[in-house]
């Protein structure tokens, strides 16, 4: 494929910033959702089966079975005025806000549009690239697949491009500070517990990245800060984020609980499961909860439909009294400042 990138006479120009996010379907129409599911689920870092078996499973069973129900869920978060999904709109808003600070900022999605190739083809010659994956924690199904796909596209289209990739920022002071600032105003109302819900991953994904046989519990001594596997252990990184948020908010351990959401299929994922705890909390006299989703920097299907809508319904049907969803960071001014700090390190 021909390289149609523009030329740029200024060889010392500043870095171009590429924001990477996971992506969304083109629309909530069944055909677009089916196309997105096929692209997403046939990624070997999502479903780790051999190629042919993975293709048969996804295209022959999963997508035909799930496309209509998934499309119905996507319709609940579709914005007709912008003809876009929140994840796309918020990511583009982040890019615009960062651009106002004097940076050249572009957006690409791992699945869907705009693609990494779209950005690379328009990248001016003589510019270097800084890739900022909008995933605070390392997981093979989010950070790793986005970064490795981006690297592969760079090798294919721009083999001489100078670039760097920002590491997961799960413990970065600026990220923790803005998360705490986002949550703090909600603590003024009476509550029984702050829930921090992270996107779950299959246990075998964790085993593949850490190369350890892990128990259902996070084993003592696994992935300490000094352990070299900590930089790829999703479970360690999420618990570290939780601990730092709790400390920043000056909350006691019993006031904060971490859970994992979005499990699909019948394999074992990281526990505890949000879906189970939602029904259990009211029985434990935890009837007023605040819930935030730190693994999502932008509101999306999983935060809005799964947690804020469906999660609230489950909680209240089980006897819960007050369910308060705390929106993601999205494109707030403090988050933009935090991203500037993360980019500059």
From Swiss-Prot:
SUPFAM superfamilies: Chelatase (SSF53800). GO terms for biological process: heme biosynthetic process. It catalyses: heme b + 2 H(+) = protoporphyrin IX + Fe(2+). Pathway: Porphyrin-containing compound metabolism; protoheme biosynthesis; protoheme from protoporphyrin-IX: step 1/1. Gene3D superfamilies: 3.40.50.1400. GO terms for molecular function: ferrochelatase activity; metal ion binding. Pfam families: Ferrochelatase. One of its GO terms (cellular component) is cytoplasm. Transmembrane segments: none annotated. It comes from the Bacteria. It is found in: Cytoplasm. InterPro entries: Ferrochelatase (IPR001015), Ferrochelatase_C (IPR033644), Ferrochelatase_N (IPR033659). Fe cation binds at residues 199, 302. It is an enzyme of class 4 (lyase). Belongs to the ferrochelatase family. This is Ferrochelatase. It comes from Porphyromonas gingivalis (strain ATCC 33277 / DSM 20709 / CIP 103683 / JCM 12257 / NCTC 11834 / 2561). The gene is hemH.
